[in-house]
A protein has these predicted regions:
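Bacterial extracytoplasmic/cell-wall-associated proteins, especially those involved in peptidoglycan
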Residues: 3-128
Length: 128
């Protein structure tokens, strides 16, 4: 999928404080209990999607795209946002990802590992 898309450069995207809040809280929901590297990786996947022509071109568009992130569909993200559950490390990871840092290359997906799925394993997720 990544090979079929065209990519914008991170310098072509500007993020708001609201984007930072949203991304940090998504990172909290998806990887709050993971090592810091796993938090950065989740943020990097979201930013990679923003930069890819295959996905929506805004951070909120990517996060709220139907069926993509489980905490959106379960209501967990809404609760985290209402209470600003994101930790300092989640905010640091969001800042790194929004500045273009990636420890997962151009990966645009992650999940819990399943047999036969090749990718980059960080914490309890595989990134691909």
């Amino acid at each position: 999928l990544a090979a079929q898309s065209s990519w914008r450069d991170i310098s072509e995207v500007s993020f708001t404080d609201g984007d930072r809040y949203l991304l940090a809280n998504l990172i909290y929901c998806e990887a709050g209990g993971e090592p810091y590297e796993g938090q950065v990786a989740v943020g990097a996947v979201v930013i990679n999607r923003v930069l890819s022509s295959v996905f929506p071109n805004t951070l909120s568009g990517v996060i709220y795209q139907s069926g993509q992130f489980e905490p959106v569909s379960t209501g967990r993200l809404a609760l985290a946002l209402a209470e600003d559950r994101a930790t300092d490390s989640c905010y640091r990871a969001a800042d790194e990802a929004m500045s273009g840092v990636t420890n997962v290359g151009n990966c645009v997906f992650f999940r819990t590992p399943i047999p036969g799925l090749e990718g980059i394993n960080i914490g309890g997720h595989v990134f691909y």
